[in-house]
Structures are given as structure tokens and as C-alpha cells.
Amino acid sequence: FGLVCATCEQIADSQHRSHRQMVTTTNPLIRHENRMVLASTTAKAMEQMAGSSEQAAEAMEVASQARQMVQAMRTIGTHPSSSAGLKNDLLENLQAYQKRMGVQMQRFK
């Protein structure tokens, strides 16, 4: 359990760093790409952590939804503003999952 917590902290810290860089970037295309990368890394992290819990199937489902959204956006070649919606969808999915798990991640707020 401690290892999972440490992994979560590490992921959250690296996401905070990339988020700070993303916020300071004014180019909308770069921000759009960063949001998609952030969604992908979050999905990957969830899949890695899911291996050690009984709610693994649910975590995998949320992660694969995020992956599919990013893949669809890359395929279609979406407008930069649409990735803001991706971020909100991903956060909603994560928060719903955490409520069911009884976990609150304060860092995402």
C-alpha cells in the first residue's frame, strides 16, 4: 500500500511540474498537446496502480476511456480548445472512480 501511495505522489508531482509548464505556455497548440499527453500519462499510471487492487477492472475501464478519448482526438485532429473538455471529462471520471474507492485526491482540485 505504501508503494502505491509513493507512486501516486511521484506521479502527482511530475504532473504538477508539467502542468506549471503548460500554464506558462501561451501557444494553444502546445497546450493542447500537453493536455493530451497528461491524459495519456494519467491513464498509464492508473493502469499500473490497478494491478495491485481488487478494483482493478474499474480502474482499467476509466484508464481505457481516457486513452480512447486521446486517440480519437489525435485521429480527428481536433481544435486546441476541445482538449479543455477532455481534461474536464478525465477529471470527472477520476473523481467518480475515487468516490467509489473512498479515496480523495486533493491535488486534482
From Swiss-Prot:
One Gene Ontology cellular component: host cell nucleus
Localization per record: Virion membrane; Host nucleus
Note: Most abundant protein in virion. When expressed alone can form virus-like particles in transfected cells.
Subunit record text: Homodimer and homomultimer. Interacts with NEP. Binds ribonucleocapsid by both interacting with genomic RNA and NP protein. May interact with HA and NA. Cannot bind NP without genomic RNA.
Function: Plays critical roles in virus replication, from virus entry and uncoating to assembly and budding of the virus particle. M1 binding to ribonucleocapsids (RNPs) in nucleus seems to inhibit viral transcription. Interaction of viral NEP with M1-RNP is thought to promote nuclear export of the complex, which is targeted to the virion assembly site at the apical plasma membrane in polarized epithelial cells. Interactions with NA and HA may bring M1, a non-raft-associated protein, into lipid rafts. Forms a continuous shell on the inner side of the lipid bilayer in virion, where it binds the RNP.
Pfam families: Flu_M1_C
Keyword Membrane annotated: yes
Chain positions covered by the region annotation RNP-binding: 22-109
Keywords: Host nucleus, Membrane, RNA-binding, Viral matrix protein, Virion
InterPro entries: Flu_matrix_M1_C, Flu_matrix_M1_N_sub2
Name of the protein this chain belongs to: Matrix protein 1
GO molecular function: RNA binding; structural constituent of virion
Domain of life: Viruses
Topology in the lipid bilayer: Multi-pass membrane protein
Gene of this entry: M
Family label: Belongs to the influenza viruses Matrix protein M1 family.
